[in-house]
């Protein structure tokens, strides 16, 4: 099991522009020689009944047993988090999109200054949305999501409460609110 400070799990798909953007990202991150950082690109795929996921360590591609449809992002995210817990010893999980650039040097400073002393980390760029005439929901954008291992474990433990009718970043915020986890 690889041990890293930062595990970057990039949600992607086999559709345009995600595939193009992921290929560009791989040029930046795949050859990263820092052993304290790891990048993995995950998507849904056509796996057979006996496989939950397949990981290609050379290309850092993780295929998950779920649809690659954009409305299945929540399921893809939960399965990717399960894979992460089972296969990588990490302190922080960064969940960007294929069009995001992650500055690991900046993150190291952020961890030290603001996150290392927290029990549960749910952080990133905060946005607000209103839906279905309900109160405003504050959420962390899926392009900049930062979680610690304890938060990822909590998400997996409570995955039955995930609202799959919402985009995954909004559904995650709803779950964090229900669990009384603050930004």
Q: Which residue ranges define each predicted feature?
A:
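N-proximal low-complexity "stem/linker" segments adjacent to membrane-targeting elements
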Residues: 1-23
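Short, acidic, metal-binding catalytic loop of nucleotide-sugar glycosyltransferases
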Residues: 3, 21-37
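Conserved, well-structured core segments
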Residues: 7-11, 39-40, 144-146, 174
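Eukaryotic intrinsically disordered and solvent-exposed regulatory patches
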Residues: 25-27, 49-50, 77-83, 132-133, ...
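A generic secondary-structure signal
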Residues: 27-31, 79-87, 110-113
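Active-site-proximal specificity loops/subdomain of glycosyltransferases
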Residues: 40-91, 101-105
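Conserved catalytic core of nucleotide-sugar-dependent glycosyltransferases
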Residues: 68, 74, 92-96, 100-183
């Amino acid at each position: 099991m690889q041990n890293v400070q930062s595990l970057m799990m990039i949600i992607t798909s086999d559709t345009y522009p995600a595939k193009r953007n992921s290929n560009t990202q791989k040029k930046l991150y795949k050859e990263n020689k820092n052993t304290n950082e790891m990048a993995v690109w995950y998507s849904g795929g056509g796996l057979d009944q006996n496989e939950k996921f397949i990981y290609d360590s050379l290309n850092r591609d993780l295929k998950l047993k779920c649809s690659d449809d954009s409305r299945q992002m929540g399921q893809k995210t939960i399965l990717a988090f399960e894979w992460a817990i089972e296969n990588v010893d990490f302190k922080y999980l960064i969940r960007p999109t294929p069009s995001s650039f992650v500055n690991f040097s900046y993150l190291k400073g952020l961890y030290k200054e603001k996150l290392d002393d927290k029990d549960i980390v749910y952080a990133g760029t905060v946005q607000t949305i209103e839906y279905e005439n309900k109160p405003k929901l504050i959420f962390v954008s899926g392009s900049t999501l930062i979680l610690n291992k304890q938060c990822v474990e909590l998400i997996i433990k409570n995955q039955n409460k995930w609202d799959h009718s919402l985009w995954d970043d909004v559904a995650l915020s709803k779950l964090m609110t229900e669990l009384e986890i603050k930004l």
